[in-house]
Amino acid sequence: MLTGCGSSAISYFPYGDEGTGGRAYEKVTSASDISLMSDGICVLSDKNVNKLTDKPSFNAKSVIVANEESAIYAKNCFKKMYPASLTKMMTAYVVFTKESDLDRVVKINGEAIKITEPYAKKMRLMDGDQLTIRQLLNAALVTSANDAAKALAVAVSGSEEKFVLLMNEEAKKIGATHSRFVNSTGLHDNAHYTTLYDQYLIFHKLLEIPEFVKIINQGSYTVEYKNALGNKVTTKVTSTNQYLAGLLRVPDGYTVIGGKTGTTDEAGSCILMSFKSSADKNYIVGILKASDSLNLYAQLGTVFENLPQNASN
């Protein structure tokens, strides 16, 4: 079994057929900033790894911390889990892969994007609203709007059912072969599942796309569009990432690039996030099924506190 990170490492993985204050995040300003971790993919065995200082333990079900060279921490990365809104990363990847014009205007079909779950996050898009693909991507990734994710699916494939076929097809191409997607949102379905390693692969692939990195790097997003009557609608949404939203301060020596969060009762609180040290070293952290948001960010804090001493200098 090979382990480590490298541009060709993935081909060796035997994965089957199937507070406030301080600088909370770094603004990505040019394509040259977006190298991130697109050069090396970590290949893991099914054994847990702990190279963090003080050897902390995590009570989340699945955890990964990786840099360009190796996995620093890995726990239950191949365990079957529910992804919640991390699903929207795969939705975004399919859009980036299949849609040639991100500025194409989409007219919303209210019935096709209906969200019935009472507490699901929404932009409250209405029948006849007109938004671009780019605006819908921002809404789905920054604030995790479920109606925006469904609108993207319908815009690209004509229906969410057809779009889901593409999600599963593209996931297999990436190597995420232990996932099954049945919707574009991540709203719970027992038949909709993943592993943390699959989510790592999807996120890693997305970090190669400059537009994705620009979107996830935002603390908030303001969208202006026309409704069915031709009137302008302006909506400002806030990132679901508490570091980017300015609710938490990133420890000195590190800056957060961005990522995707997810929460359902069944999935718990989840995150995939990219950050880097002042030594310009890039990291990905993934956590699935923390007990709640407070616990999730406490565990992220533990990651920052226990990275090897030379990470931030």
PLM region descriptions:
Residues 6-11, 176-177, 188-193, 197-313:
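Domain-terminus/edge residues, biased toward the C-terminal soluble/receptor-binding domains
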Residues 9-197, 201, 206-207:
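Active-site-adjacent loops and short helices of periplasmic peptidoglycan-processing enzymes
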